[in-house]
């Protein structure tokens, strides 16, 4: 029951473009980003510190770094445009900043897909106390 409540809170907290990120993860990786990566390892979900625990957690670390390089728009709230061409996600639109957000999300979704086999349930709702090591630079 506690897990369902936490997932409901995570879903309510998803704003603007973060729902687009969820959609991209579903399209590319074939699984729910909120469910699988909403609170995984040291970097998936809110915040992020320490060292990535596995390749899936590293996808989130790289995604956080990518968002950190975006200037001129809000990666968590602004909407972007994309299309699907021959099964591939193609980021579009006239706004280079929003296109950057899309590229960050697309790369993370591909990373999740390519690292599904590294996903380990022991990192789901991983305690923050286990993420105290110094973070590596982006």
From Swiss-Prot:
CDD domains the record matches: PLA2c
Disulfide bonds: 42-131, 44-60, 59-111, 65-138, 66-104, 73-97, 91-102
Signal peptide: 1-16
Cofactor: Ca(2+)
Subcellular location: Secreted
List of residues binding Ca(2+): 43, 45, 47, 64
Reaction equation(s) it catalyzes: a 1,2-diacyl-sn-glycero-3-phosphocholine + H2O = a 1-acyl-sn-glycero-3-phosphocholine + a fatty acid + H(+)
SUPFAM superfamilies referenced in this protein's UniProt entry, alphabetically: Phospholipase A2, PLA2 (SSF48619)
Summary of the tissues where the protein is detected: Expressed by the venom gland.
Naturally occurring in which organism (per UniProt): Craspedocephalus gramineus (Bamboo pit viper)
A single GO molecular function term of this UniProt record: calcium-dependent phospholipase A2 activity
An annotated GO BP: negative regulation of T cell proliferation
Comment on bound cofactor: Binds 1 Ca(2+) ion.
First-tier enzyme category under EC: hydrolase
Family: Belongs to the phospholipase A2 family. Group II subfamily. D49 sub-subfamily.
Protein name (Swiss-Prot/TrEMBL): Acidic phospholipase A2 1
